[in-house]
Amino acid sequence: MANKPFFRRRKVCPFSGDNAPAIDYKDTRLLQRYISERGKIVPSRITAVSAKKQRELARAIKRARFLALLPYAVK
């Protein structure tokens, strides 16, 4: 009995495609989704964000932290 190997479907980047949200450092509700409960940036292999958009996202999160819109760490 031959088993087929488990096929994991590739997730699609939430920031690519039509009517995708723009990455903006002032949009804290959107950025909060990509930060862990400890305040760290969640890696793209978990969130399925493309490499280019992950860099934009990280830059926006760091900008928002600098302007005190988001916390650096959560206790």
From Swiss-Prot:
The keyword Transmembrane helix does not apply. It comes from Paracoccus denitrificans (strain Pd 1222). This is Small ribosomal subunit protein bS18. Binds as a heterodimer with protein bS6 to the central domain of the 16S rRNA, where it helps stabilize the platform of the 30S subunit. GO terms for cellular component: cytosolic small ribosomal subunit. Coiled coil: none annotated. GO terms for molecular function: small ribosomal subunit rRNA binding; structural constituent of ribosome. Keywords: Ribonucleoprotein, Ribosomal protein, RNA-binding, rRNA-binding. InterPro entries: Ribosomal_bS18, Ribosomal_bS18_CS, Ribosomal_bS18_sf. The keyword rRNA-binding applies. It comes from the Bacteria. PROSITE patterns: RIBOSOMAL_S18 (PS00057). Belongs to the bacterial ribosomal protein bS18 family.
